[in-house]
Swiss-Prot record:
Described purpose of this protein according to its UniProt entry: Plays a central role in 2-thiolation of mcm(5)S(2)U at tRNA wobble positions of tRNA(Lys), tRNA(Glu) and tRNA(Gln). Directly binds tRNAs and probably acts by catalyzing adenylation of tRNAs, an intermediate required for 2-thiolation. It is unclear whether it acts as a sulfurtransferase that transfers sulfur from thiocarboxylated URM1 onto the uridine of tRNAs at wobble position.
EC number: 2.7.7.-
Statement: the UniProt record of this protein carries the keyword Transferase: yes
Pfam families per the UniProt record, alphabetical: ATP_bind_3 (PF01171), zn-ribbon_14 (PF16503)
Similarity section: Belongs to the TtcA family. CTU1/NCS6/ATPBD3 subfamily.
Principal location listed in the UniProt entry: cytoplasm
Cellular localisation: Cytoplasm
GO cellular component: cytosolic tRNA wobble base thiouridylase complex
Top EC class, one word: transferase
The protein's name in its UniProt record: Cytoplasmic tRNA 2-thiolation protein 1
Region spans: Disordered: 337-363
Amino acid sequence: MDSAVDGPRQPPARAGSRLCTRCGERKAALKRPKTLEQICRECFYVVFEDEIHQTIVDNNLFKPGDRVAIGASGGKDSTVLAYVLSELNRRHKYCLDLFLLSVDEGITGYRDDSLETVKRNEIQYGLPLKIVSYKDLYGWTMDDIVKAIGLKNNCTFCGVFRRQALDRGAALLKVDKIVTGHNADDIAETVLLNILRGDIARLSRCTFITTGEDGPIPRCKPFKYTYEKEIVMYAYFKKLDYFSTECIYSPNAYRGFAREFIKDLERMRPRAILDIIKSGENFRISTTTRMPEQGTCERCGYISSQKLCKACVLLDGLNRGLPKLGIGRTKGIAGGDGDCEQQATRSERNRSSLQGKHGNFDF
């Protein structure tokens, strides 16, 4: 997942005048964060790309002839993913048809700038680009949503809408798989967050390298074992064109604490990130709990275990002027328009009651 954790681009720390521990011929240019090996630039390219290739092969992520959409935001992770996957596709004859797929959330001063980077990547890598927008799909931009609800719950709307937008864009491209730039750091953070929240259901699947196999289009994470620092180093040495600004609506304080904690662990033990992922894989708890059967949303046709999908529930709240209608628990809302009416009535009644006792509240 793309994030600007490193601030302005800085050259990686050099490894002094020692020789590369792999080839023994060229001077070492960096110390690998994952292994602490001091290696030259050329050997770094080789091991970085080979490890990703091995991950793809070991997990059977693709088969010849697959049409694959690369979730492209213009950030470092998705840019490196597009570049490396293009190279590996040619070198190892994966025989994949690759596409860039971007989502325009409608964030002025952020997404419009990053999409310019993606458009340059389209030309640089020779990959067709498809852009889908919140405005076209939902009638709202994130700028509009933030004006309506403020900053507190905006990531909930964006996460739900973005996931569905990627699926809808992928369906338009008729692809077999979506690949995303989620890296080892992202997955380790998610493992830790799910443990802290006690979310066993998400913990059981957050380390899967392929998800959504029961959904419309499976998603793969070729960077599952790739360190964020090494992605930054690769992009720097290769002089790749990427966008490095953080989303203006995404402070993500809770995840930020998890990220800093993992960085502290990594400084003490470089393998800490992989150890956390391994722990998450071994933490899967078998359960006899029956999962809800997947159906389709009565309104938009998207996959859902309820009558209305989460996106339609959230949109219902926005369009009714009750943007918090779909936040948190949605039991009762998902049952259809009648339930939405009841929930809206309850929300209005509760708001009136609270205002009568305590004055105005920002609901």
